[in-house]
Amino acid sequence: MRVVVIGSEGFIGQALVARLLRDAPLGERALPASLVTRLDVRMGAASSSPRVRCVEGDIGDRAALARAFEGGVDCVFHLASIPGGSAEQHFALGLRVNLQATIDMLETLRASGHKPQFIFASSIGVYGVPMPSVIDEQTIPAPTLSYGAHKYIGELLVADYGRRGYIDGRSVRVPGIVARPPSEGMYSIFLSNLIRELSAGQNFICPVAANAPSWWMSRPCVVDNLLHATTLPARVVTKQRTFLLPVLRLTISEVVQALAAVHGPEVSGRISYQPDATLQAQFANYPPLHCPYSEFVGFRHDGDAMALVRRALDPA
């Protein structure tokens, strides 16, 4: 399997590439990656693996895309994006990277005739705020940020190009992934900071209330789900090309309790609360989420809070 990872140097992309190089099974035939092409605007550490090819370039540059897809491609993971906070502050940049670059990728693949699997990392940002009292697989997206709008349009494009046979498109709606490195462009970064800083013995000021429920998933778990998306048979994706991932719905206090169980009871004394009105409105009232079809076809969450906090700091 010839694989291209777009956004390979990001938080999820690095873990996905590492898993691919450990021969994670891909597709219905469970084949390993024979070649992994990394594409990002800036390359990280070089790989010694002969199965890795690096293409440094802007994902909105069709020449860079053509180099990445050169020689044929069987599976594309599109992970690159400008996150919510940055996309709100820099509208033109968000539009170019999140939307126009996605169109350019799809058009480049259409022109090439490769017809690969195309795994699109969408987002729960498509639902906007306030959310309905329950989210399920029939809930109609209603994004309230540019980032969510870009992701929803991306889903529709992936489904349409899939319907027309230009690609084998599969979109997964990704929740907040922990524990990301520090970032100024992501509104939900405090969820990652909480786990990372409390695990490291630091004090943490939480910008939402202790009883605020959020949706949680570790990086290894989202990589599991992205890889699983490649294995779904055609009859599954013909019926539905966008999948809502199962999540753990946990309050801040439940996550802190799990951290205390893993790292010691002193963890509970290192957190204080100063709710921020904007973050409280955006992240403090996530409703129950039901996605029985996604679970039926094999997508999974981390299991429980203890597993989440243990896996959250794993490299891949």
Residue positions per predicted region:
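NAD(P)-dependent short-chain dehydrogenase/reductase
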Residues: A159-S214, R219-D224
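N-terminal Rossmann NAD(P)H-binding glycine-rich loop of SDR-like oxidoreductase domains
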Residues: M1-L26
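Amphipathic terminal alpha-helices
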Residues: P288-E295, R300-A316
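Active-site Tyr-X1-5-Lys
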Residues: V129, A142-R170, S199
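Glycine-rich NAD(P)-binding loop of the Rossmann-fold in SDR/ketoreductase-type enzymes
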Residues: G60, Q89, L93-D104, P141, ...
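Mid/C-terminal beta-alpha module of Rossmann-like enzyme folds, strongest
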Residues: N225-L279
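NAD(P)H-binding glycine-rich loop region in Rossmannoid oxidoreductase-like domains
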Residues: E56-V97
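Conserved Rossmann-fold NAD(P)-dependent oxidoreductase catalytic core, especially the SDR/UDP-sugar
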Residues: I103-S146
